């Protein structure tokens, strides 16, 4: 969300946008309490030294020209582990639908610290993250694992097998 939008849009529109972004990022079916979202909007609209806050399982982080929103790792880590199928999409973390093109015994879980370390060792993620997205945000990204082996991180375009496809789509649209 750009500061330009924050400065141009009416408070009511911004509150609705923030509610929806937080719902999408958290996987919640209900919006956060309006008073809490109003507090976030007030914080975003003011000059202060606080760089990040959380609400409803979402980290809201101020950057130079925009604000980013991403799932808190602790909420993501408690999500039920899903074993994707080839026949239909399964929901993971109330945020993503996942399906495979081949039957494999894989589990979907957040990338976490271990996965981020692997991605850094392969030079896919840098010390600061990737594409202006911090490492802390990548930790909550969906990934596929075979026991302790990282097989795929769809959002990073990483997969150990060329003939293996993962179909990933958002549960909710912003």
Features from the language model and the residues they span:
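AMP-forming adenylation/ATP pyrophosphatase catalytic core
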Residues: 1-174
């Amino acid at each position: 969300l750009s500061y330009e939008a924050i400065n141009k849009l009416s408070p009511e529109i911004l509150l609705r946008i923030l509610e929806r972004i937080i719902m999408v990022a958290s996987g919640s079916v209900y919006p956060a309490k309006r008073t809490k979202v109003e507090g976030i909007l007030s914080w975003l609209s003011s000059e202060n030294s606080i760089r990040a806050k959380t609400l409803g399982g979402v980290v809201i982080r101020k950057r130079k020209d925009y604000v980013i929103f991403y799932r808190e790792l602790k909420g993501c880590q408690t999500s039920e582990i899903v074993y994707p199928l080839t026949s239909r999409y399964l929901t993971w973390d109330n945020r993503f639908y996942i399906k495979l093109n081949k039957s494999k015994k894989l589990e979907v879980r957040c990338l976490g610290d271990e996965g981020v370390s692997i991605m850094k060792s392969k030079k896919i993620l840098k010390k600061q993250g990737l594409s202006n997205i911090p490492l802390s945000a990548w930790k909550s990204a969906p990934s596929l694992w075979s026991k302790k082996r990282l097989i795929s991180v769809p959002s990073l375009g990483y997969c150990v097998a060329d003939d293996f496809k993962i179909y990933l789509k958002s549960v909710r649209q912003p």
